[in-house]
Amino acid sequence: NGVFSYGTGTTVNISESMITTTADNSGGIQTTGGTTNATNLVVSTSGNSSAAIRSDRGGGTVNVDGGSYVSNGYNSPAVYSTADITVKNAFLTANNSEALVIEGKNSITLENCTVTGNMSDTKGSSSEENVHNVMIYQSMSGDADVGTSTFSMTGGTLTAKNGDMIYVTNTHCVLTLSGVTIQNKDADGALLRVVGNSASHGWGTAGSNGAQVEFTADNQTLSGDIVVDTISTLNMKLTGGSTFTGTINIVDNAQNGTAVSNNAVVTIESGCTWTLTGDCVITSLTNSGTINFNGYTITLADGTVLR
């Protein structure tokens, strides 16, 4: 690793520096306990499993302001979090991986960042389950405590070159987007996928390893499809004048797990708009805003069909 903070009570301060790593398993800045404060760094990693900003067992706190953080290997996000990581005013680029990963009871908070991921397939990836730009999960490996994962992004740009924008599995997640420009270059990629997984990597037990997501979009423009499987839950709220153009649908769990209730609960506050691009199936809807049906329908769990 280029810079390494280890152990509770350790503090590393670094600024105006260039860090380059070339080997596998070699991150740019790594925190395993303690605190790392980084300002205006230029970080580049070339190896596989070499996130530009990363943490490991032991958690810790990472504060980054300014700079450029680029990874080039497989399984090498720009940021991999098993800690509490805050990044402001930075460029975060993963050229052969998803852009961001949060594992377990940890967080990534971004403010005014330009984030780009390019996970073209699952080769060499930590996920054989899905191609995506942001992954939020619990591996059950012991690297991260079980608990709520938190992803918050305010301002900036979030770009996916392939796959789904956000993929959540086997964890509880609080997700907040506010004023982010979201660009998915893959027309077939979902905006958000909240599902179980095959457990081939040990991520929980197949059929009972869904995700639970609380998603707030505030002053946010959203576009794309949202998919929730029958062993997962999504509580989604549009607020602050947000607009969503797309669909929300509940699908069967691929591993035939026992279904849970309240799979997709949607709240649209006053001043917000949902424009449908296809038929939708959700659990319930609280609407104080506007829905443009465009000839499509919303089917609720009680059998009500809105049109």
Where are these regions (language model features)?
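Beta-strand-rich solenoid/repeat architectures in extracellular/passenger domains
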Residues: 1, 10-25, 35-49, 53, ...
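Predominantly extracellular/luminal carbohydrate-interaction, adhesion, and secreted-enzyme modules
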Residues: 1-7, 27-33, 50-57, 74-82, ...
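A generic short-segment signal for beta-strand/edge and adjacent turn/coil regions
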Residues: 6-8, 12, 22-23, 32, ...
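Generic structural motif
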Residues: 8, 58, 105, 118, ...
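Short "repeat-start/strand-capping" segments in structured domains, especially the N-termini
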Residues: 8-11, 33-37, 60, 82-85, ...
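Clustered cysteine/histidine zinc-coordinating segments, centered on FYVE zinc fingers that bind PI3P
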Residues: 130-143, 147, 155, 163, ...
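Extracellular beta-solenoid/beta-roll
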Residues: 184, 204-214, 219-307
